[in-house]
Amino acid sequence: MHDLKALRADPAAFDAALARRGLSPVGQQLVSDDEGRRAALAALQEAQGARKALAKEIGLLKRQKLDTAEIEAKAVALRDQIAGLEERANTIQTRIDDVLKSLPNCLDASVPDGKGEDENVVVHVRGEKREFAFEAKQHFELGEALGLMDFPTAAKLSGTRFVVLRGALARLERALGQFMLDTHTTEFGYSETSVPLLVNDDAMYGTDKLPKFAEDSFRTEDGRWLIPTAEVPLTASVMGEILPADALPIRMTALSQCFRSEAGSAGRDVRGMLRQHQFTKCELVSVVKPEDSDAEHERMTQAAETVLERLGITFRRMLLCAGDTGFGAAKTFDLEAWLPGQKAWREISSCSNTRDFQARRMNARYRAENGPAFVNTLNGSGLAVGRTMIAVMETYQNEDGSIDIPEVLRPYMGGLNRIG
């Protein structure tokens, strides 16, 4: 949600921010609507005052046993006027709210202009692409040949975009999640949290998933939502709160199942585990004071990078351009892993600073020196477990189809150093 007071002060600047995302100007119309709303509220207050005065006068006349018919008629007229003004103010407010709810976050000045992912900027590359003496296979070729990645059974059970992992691959998935949690909790101070996988409308709206992304999520018959990411319950845990200043920063992490309908993804990544309806992800969320937001964004991104570095996965950090930055983000870094089997860079983490965009939607504040102020919220993947497993499989594959286990994962694998 946006600050209407700031918008009123400079609607042209607001429209310029929207233009960076390729959106049409709405600032002046919002200001005009807000002026109409304020005028209706002022007239409403005046009419309510007049009606209150008439009520006193009617009471006085009745005590004196005098005729009140004329004044009561005025009171009835005022009642109807008040109802009309209330309806007008509410109608305008709803119109303003509907527009504001539909508008994405304003981008940071440091976000480069651009229309899509081809115009994202490489910040740095870590590691070297492994050279193979054989033709590297894709993860699903490796997994199926080992008999440990079963798509037909998953399709029988649930349809497309699901997988059944067996044996050592199932254990590898679990090991990766545990390794991520251990890294983030012991080295970066995130508090491990177990969260519900079902949330209500308020949690989804507050974390900018509703109304825009309703089609991308699964809704149950009782109106709750399967979480598309643990960002939703972690961030929404401070919804409606006024936090003590000394409680910040709050850093939380959760390893959870995530559920996405993948609406609009028909024909994309149909083979393998890259794009699924259900997947495991280690999520990072920070709640901070506004002045600490930029440093926290860098810290969070480095935490995600640390996992990739320890695993020996070649990756690059990308600064997303205006046209590729998500709806709720002011600035986003993506981490893309090199997949030798695909011969392509693929997103494995996305770390975003939403500034106070989510906080305004959630009414999440802290006790600042001059009164309650909105917190800043940040979220990031630390990492997507399935995609990290894909990177491990393709990076550490051998010519015979076996897969070496990265050294840091071996304690989580009972000392196993190779699959296959």
Swiss-Prot record:
GO cellular component: cytoplasm
UniProt subcellular location: Cytoplasm
Entry superkingdom: Bacteria
Residue sites binding ATP per the record: R260, S261, E262, E347, I348, S349, S350
SUPFAM superfamilies in the record: Class II aaRS and biotin synthetases, tRNA-binding arm
The enzyme's E.C. designation: 6.1.1.11
Amino acids binding L-serine: T229, A230, E231, E283, S381
Main location: cytoplasm
Catalytic activity of the protein: tRNA(Ser) + L-serine + ATP = L-seryl-tRNA(Ser) + AMP + diphosphate + H(+); tRNA(Sec) + L-serine + ATP = L-seryl-tRNA(Sec) + AMP + diphosphate + H(+)
MF terms in GO: ATP binding; serine-tRNA ligase activity
Database matches in Pfam families: Seryl_tRNA_N, tRNA-synt_2b
Family stated for the protein in its record: Belongs to the class-II aminoacyl-tRNA synthetase family. Type-1 seryl-tRNA synthetase subfamily.
Assembly with partners or alone: Homodimer. The tRNA molecule binds across the dimer.
Annotated PANTHER family: SERINE--TRNA LIGASE, SERYL-TRNA SYNTHETASE
Domain notes: Consists of two distinct domains, a catalytic core and a N-terminal extension that is involved in tRNA binding.
Protein name: Serine--tRNA ligase
